[in-house]
Amino acid sequence: MGSVRVEDFELVNVEVPDLKEEGDFLVRNIWMSVDPFLRIYMTKGTKHAPPFELNKSLEGGCIGKVIESKSSKFKVGDYVKANFGWRKYWIGKETQSEEKSISKVNSTLGPLRSFLGLLGITGITAYVGLFKICNL
């Protein structure tokens, strides 16, 4: 297994394709999550998901802003949270919203980065563990 090293990663520039279909929208990532569970997917994966593929972008939580849209659900200027991970831009489709956990973020509730921590799955996990299981 070994430790993850800088040499294990590569920064690659790719062309961002044009939006082709109704329901497509282009997002520029602002925040990306680096969670401990990602380490599992760098080796063997789990019963819930296969390991990361070599020479592909790492998947994981991200917060971004819709900068172009052919979607009635996700409009230019909307902030969204998804599992598209480590990339500067990504194209989402309305039909992927459940599969890739794409959802709008209400930026008035707190700093955007909070939706990957305190207001995200890690915050919910901590809350349930402390207050529902440990009864604190």
Where are these regions (language model features)?
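Intrinsically disordered, low-complexity boundary segments flanking structured domains
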Residues: 1-2, 53, 78, 105
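Beta-strand acidic-aromatic groove motif in beta-rich domains, primarily in extracellular
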Residues: 39
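Glycine-rich beta-strand-centered segment in the early N-terminal region that forms part
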Residues: 12-34, 42-86
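NAD(P)H dinucleotide-binding glycine-rich loop of Rossmann-like/cofactor-binding domains
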Residues: 58-65, 76-136
